[in-house]
């Protein structure tokens, strides 16, 4: 046997002898004063009818149009949350949740009630759908919100704290005061504002504001409100549905493509970038998008790893969070916020748009 072959054999044997070890990921992090705190908010946005019918979206049929099954999302979330008490999730669309709820055994319902009570599962916004804010009459908006809130109160004895209108095309001051502050929300978050407005607000750190939507009611009906830096999706390369192509955090040194240092560096860089356009040391990452978490384990496995290794690195602090936790943290800073008094209309999402949006397609 030649020297090269012998050397190769020793290397191969060495690699085969490396043993993997179980890693207990530390996901118990909480807010750390003085650091940039990255609030990882796990969520799905489930359109109550879009490319498919409501029934098709719920059961997962007609997937030649779009691979989406809300039933899978909710079925998958419950065991994922039970696997780690530090994990959190928010859910919005009551039209789907109530269907799913009626399909569950009393045993599962009791488990979900415990998850809601503990704060692991937060039901936010609370309406049957995420209504448009331009075309509907305000009575219809009130009715569909009331219908959802009544169910949540009756079944869970909680009242949603957060407005979460992330996908309507533009936003109305009426939503801010009548279906925000007057409903009792502590804050209101949204994704779609005009691209020019978003760029300006990034520059002067005014994506988050105090929104005083009623001139007659004044400060008595104002609400803390925030637009996301880039719609309602995660930062680039942090999508982890089972068929997504973002690079995973590979932390097994006995396998190829070990990349903990590289992935942590990317995470910290993205956190710093958002902190530079945000007031206070708290930033929110919306970890999810349309019809995600159909296999929740793939998301939580990666978020567990990021929280563990990013916090070992120490430059920023990552934690499982919810919009309520994020809102409380923002309030606690006693920051002064810009004042907003009018609509976020009209809406265009890119420069080449020929027409501005003022409501749904």
What function would you assign to each model-found segment?
Residues 3-20:
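Cleavable N-terminal signal peptides of Sec/SRP-targeted secreted and luminal proteins
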Residues 18-361:
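Catalytic-domain carbohydrate-binding cleft regions of carbohydrate-active enzymes
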């Amino acid at each position: 046997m030649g020297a090269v072959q012998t050397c190769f054999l020793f290397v191969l044997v060495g690699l085969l002898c490396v043993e993997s070890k179980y890693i207990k990921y530390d996901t118990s992090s909480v807010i750390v004063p003085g650091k940039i705190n990255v609030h990882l908010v796990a969520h799905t946005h489930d359109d109550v009818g879009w490319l498919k019918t409501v029934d098709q979206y719920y059961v997962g049929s007609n997937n030649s149009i779009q691979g989406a099954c809300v039933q899978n999302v909710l079925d998958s979330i419950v065991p994922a949350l039970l696997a780690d008490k530090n994990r959190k999730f928010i859910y919005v669309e009551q039209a789907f949740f109530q269907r799913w709820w009626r399909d569950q055994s009393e045993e599962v319902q009791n488990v979900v009630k415990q998850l809601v009570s503990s704060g692991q599962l937060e039901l936010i916004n609370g309406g049957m759908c995420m209504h448009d804010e331009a075309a509907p009459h305000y009575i219809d908006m009130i009715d569909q919100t009331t219908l959802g809130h009544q169910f949540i109160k009756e079944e869970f004895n909680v009242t949603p704290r957060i407005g979460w209108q992330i996908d309507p095309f533009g936003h109305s001051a009426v939503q801010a005061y009548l279906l925000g502050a007057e409903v009792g929300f502590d804050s209101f978050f949204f994704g779609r504002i005009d691209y020019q407005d978003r760029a300006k607000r990034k520059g002067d750190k005014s994506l988050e504001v105090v929104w005083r939507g009623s001139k007659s009611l004044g400060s008595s009906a104002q609400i803390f409100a925030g637009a996301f830096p880039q719609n309602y999706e995660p930062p680039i390369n942090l999508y982890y549905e089972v068929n997504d192509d973002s690079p995973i955090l590979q932390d097994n040194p006995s396998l190829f493509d070990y990349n903990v240092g590289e992935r942590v560096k990317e995470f910290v860089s993205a956190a710093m970038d958002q902190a530079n356009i945000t007031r206070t040391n708290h930033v929110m990452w919306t970890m999810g998008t349309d019809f995600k978490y159909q296999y929740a384990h793939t998301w939580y496995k990666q978020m567990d790893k990021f929280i563990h290794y990013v916090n070992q690195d120490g430059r920023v602090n990552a934690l499982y969070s919810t919009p309520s936790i994020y809102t409380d943290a923002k309030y606690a800073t006693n920051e002064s916020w810009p004042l907003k008094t009018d609509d976020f209309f009209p809406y265009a999402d890119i420069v080449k748009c020929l027409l501005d949006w003022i409501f749904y397609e």
